[in-house]
Structure formats: structure tokens, C-alpha cells
């Protein structure tokens, strides 16, 4: 980004050359071959075609690790790995999910769950995703300046799609949106989630955000289908492949924070967080819960969070 800022001369022929080894599947160099590929002329070198390399050693590596292993891709073939050692969701996993074809009709028996990520401001955008079983789609993404206007838009989406449950990011900007939705009568279906709050399985995950993102990875392995067309297809791919993870001193999985991602030059994963929020807690489909009589007579309100 610093380099691009200096290449703004109008009447100067500008040549920008980026050399590197494809050792990581994230970062600005990776995006020269993916998101920004149309802006660059690519030259790729396979080690086996270089005159000075030890062909016998390279052949042995291919035999030991396999032609399609990440080790051979990086050290021999000169192409990007499917996943870095610390990448939670690999590009290959996302690619497979984008090739699956599902419709809402295929998952009609599953609960409908809405995930709402509220932007903190700046370049971040608010995003809304709807998941039903293995099917998912984006409903909304936009820069949000007024919390009340965004709350009214969410109320419209809740009325239109009638999810069994909706989970909203309760960060700095999310709390007033949540309060407004409750005031509008959606308190029975919406639940606020703090990314830093304790995980349901706090023996395995540092916080709820780490737990939700790991659930997304499992959902993809289990057959989840991602959009393959439209701007949301590239947005969700970029987001899901971006965060890295590690295990803390207590052996709990911890997802890379948004602040650390920004230090690596990566934007906030707004779409990824919205999708992850659809895994915030188990949800029971409205039609699967029989009406129950309360202690004071009449029927109890539907509670989707019966877990």
C-alpha cells in the first residue's frame, strides 16, 4: 500500500515488480495472483525447469510428499499452498464449497439462522448472512453510519426472511442496534453475542469467536455450500481464508484478532464474522417446538435458544 501511494505520477511510465516465493496463502503478494490478478502479468518458475537445481532431490521430494502436497507446491512447483501452517480455513476447502450446488429447497427442514456483523466504522462494513443447514447467502453489506437506520433495515430483513434465530455482534456499535430491535419486538428471536465472551466449550476454545469460526471450518468439511457468483463469492472467500490461529498456553484454540489482521494489511473479515455468527449457539426450528402451556395459563412464547 505504501508503494502504491507513491505511484501516482500522471505522465510517468510506472513499472512495479513484485518478486517472492509463494510460501503463504494470505497477504498482499498472494492477492497479486488472486484478487488483483487482472492487474499483473505473472511469471511462474517451477524448480524442476531451472538449470541449477538438484533434479534428483526434487524428484525424491515429490515421491515422499506427493505432487499435490503443500510442501511440493511451495518448494518444488513454485505455487501457493492450499493452507499455511496457521491458516484455519484453507483455500481448497473454500473452493470445494463454492463448487457445491444447493438451494433453500434442499435444506427446507433445517432452522434458518441469521448472522449480523455490525461495522465499527472506518473502512469496515456491516454484513448480514442467512444460513439454513448447508446453504448460505448474503442478505446485506454496506457501510453503516446510523445505528437506528441499520436497525430499521434489519427489522425489514427479519420480517421478510423470518429466521428461527438471529445472532448480532454486540461490539461497540452493535449494542444500540440490538436494543432498537428488541424495542421493535424482535427480542424473542435475536440474541446478542460478544466475540470475546466465553465459549460454550471453554475447554477447547479461548472465546466465542474462535469457537464460531472453528464451527464454520467444520461446516465446510461437512458439505457446506458457499456462493459461487456475485461479489459475495469473492468477499467470503477472502474473509474465510484470511485469519490464522494458534493454541495458547492452556491448549485452547485462539483465532487471530482483527487488530492483528490489520497489522498484516488485511481488512476486517465482515462477511466471515457474519457467517460465523450463524454458529453462535444451537438453534431449534420454530416448527419443531410444540406449543407449551405456561404455569399461568395460555401458551409460552417460542424460544429458539433451547440449548
Model-derived regions, located:
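N-terminal accessory regions of nucleic-acid-interacting proteins
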Residues: 91-97
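Short, flexible loop motifs at catalytic/binding sites
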Residues: 1-85, 104-307
Amino acid at each position: 500500500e505504501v508503494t502504491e501511494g507513491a505511484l501516482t505520477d500522471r505522465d510517468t511510465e510506472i513499472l512495479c515488480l513484485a518478486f517472492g516465493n509463494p510460501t503463504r496463502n494470505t497477504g498482499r503478494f498472494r492477492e497479486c495472483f488472486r484478487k488483483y490478478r487482472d492487474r499483473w502479468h505473472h511469471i511462474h518458475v517451477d524448480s524442476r525447469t531451472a538449470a541449477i537445481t538438484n533434479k534428483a532431490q526434487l524428484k525424491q521430494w515429490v515421491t515422499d510428499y506427493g505432487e499435490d502436497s503443500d510442501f511440493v507446491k511451495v518448494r518444488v512447483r513454485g505455487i501457493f499452498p492450499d493452507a499455511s501452517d496457521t491458516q484455519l480455513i484453507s483455500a481448497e476447502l473454500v473452493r470445494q464449497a463454492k463448487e457445491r450446488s444447493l438451494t433453500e429447497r434442499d435444506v427446507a427442514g433445517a432452522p434458518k439462522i441469521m448472522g449480523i456483523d455490525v461495522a465499527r466504522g472506518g473502512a469496515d462494513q456491516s454484513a448480514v448472512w442467512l444460513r439454513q443447514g448447508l446453504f448460505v447467502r448474503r442478505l446485506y453489506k454496506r457501510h453503516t453510519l446510523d445505528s437506528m437506520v441499520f436497525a430499521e433495515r434489519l427489522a425489514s430483513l427479519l420480517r421478510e426472511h423470518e429466521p428461527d434465530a438471529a445472532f448480532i455482534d454486540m461490539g461497540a456499535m452493535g449494542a444500540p442496534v440490538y436494543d432498537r430491535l428488541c424495542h421493535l419486538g424482535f427480542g424473542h428471536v435475536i440474541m446478542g453475542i460478544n466475540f470475546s465472551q466465553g465459549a460454550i466449550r471453554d475447554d477447547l476454545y479461548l472465546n466465542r469467536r474462535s469457537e464460531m469460526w472453528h464451527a464454520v471450518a467444520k461446516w465446510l468439511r461437512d458439505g457446506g455450500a458457499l456462493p459461487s457468483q456475485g461479489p459475495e463469492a469473492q468477499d467470503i472467500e477472502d474473509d474465510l481464508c484470511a485469519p490464522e490461529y494458534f493454541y495458547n498456553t492452556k491448549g485452547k484454540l485462539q483465532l487471530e484478532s482483527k487488530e492483528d489482521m490489520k497489522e498484516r494489511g488485511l481488512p476486517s473479515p465482515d462477511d466471515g464474522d457474519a457467517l460465523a455468527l450463524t454458529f453462535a449457539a444451537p438453534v431449534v426450528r420454530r416448527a419443531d417446538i410444540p406449543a407449551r402451556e405456561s404455569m399461568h395459563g395460555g401458551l409460552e412464547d417460542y424460544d429458539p435458544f433451547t440449548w
